[in-house]
Amino acid sequence: MRTRVKICGLTREADIAQAIEAGVDAIGLICYAGSKRYVDLARAARLRREVPAFVSVVTLFVNPAPDEVRAVLDHVGPDLLQFHGDESPEDCTRYGHRFMRAFRVGAAGLDSAGAIAAACRPYHEAAGWLFDSYSSGYGGSGLTFDHSLLAEVQADAGSRPLVLAGGLNPDNIAQALALVQPWAVDVSSGVESGPGLKSADKMKEFLKRIKKVDDDLHA
């Protein structure tokens, strides 16, 4: 099995083209106005049109109003919704669309292996559980966390995909994959030259190192 890769926080057409050339499986568009990588509805729709078949588009929200999500569904047409705030299971399922729920490891109530596993269980309809590190603001933190805290979640997850995020970059991805072996990884700032400005070289190197780990693990 190979590790799937999502690059999040894309804001430019050229970056999408370079991410696809590097071999990414999914791209993330941030629909949360509090993020430095925010794209508005019209911009998100334009960027979505740059994505070819067989590459997924994920739109990220943080505690959105229902009308915001419905507008994105209507005008952008994402393959997957990503909820990265305090959304309840009902908040996530109300749209009848596939979704992924993010958990900020280290937040209150998410600071032990057992607590993290318990927090995930109500979201049994999610297409995946994503694990990021906690920071005082919402959205991606760019920080790493203790990956050993996911052991109990992995035992619980069954066939549900686990997505590892939080401070990943070309220099630390091999170690993270060796410990967790997730279904997918999600990266943003770790492949940037500045907020929302992706580096083609860093994206290529990130994908290259993931492929090497996958090849070594499954040789």
From Swiss-Prot:
Protein known as: N-(5'-phosphoribosyl)anthranilate isomerase
Catalytic activity: N-(5-phospho-beta-D-ribosyl)anthranilate = 1-(2-carboxyphenylamino)-1-deoxy-D-ribulose 5-phosphate
Origin species: Bordetella avium (strain 197N)
CDD domains for the chain: PRAI
Keyword Isomerase applies: yes
Record has Metal-binding as a keyword: no
Matching NCBIfam families: PRK01222.1-4 (NF002298)
Protein origin, superkingdom: Bacteria
Organism taxonomic ancestry: Bacteria, Pseudomonadati, Pseudomonadota, Betaproteobacteria, Burkholderiales
Family: Belongs to the TrpF family.
EC numbers, comma separated: 5.3.1.24
Biological pathway: Amino-acid biosynthesis; L-tryptophan biosynthesis; L-tryptophan from chorismate: step 3/5
Class of this enzyme: isomerase
Molecular-function annotations in GO: phosphoribosylanthranilate isomerase activity
One GO-annotated biological process of the protein: L-tryptophan biosynthetic process
A Pfam entry, by short name: PRAI
Keywords in alphabetical order: Amino-acid biosynthesis, Aromatic amino acid biosynthesis, Isomerase, Tryptophan biosynthesis
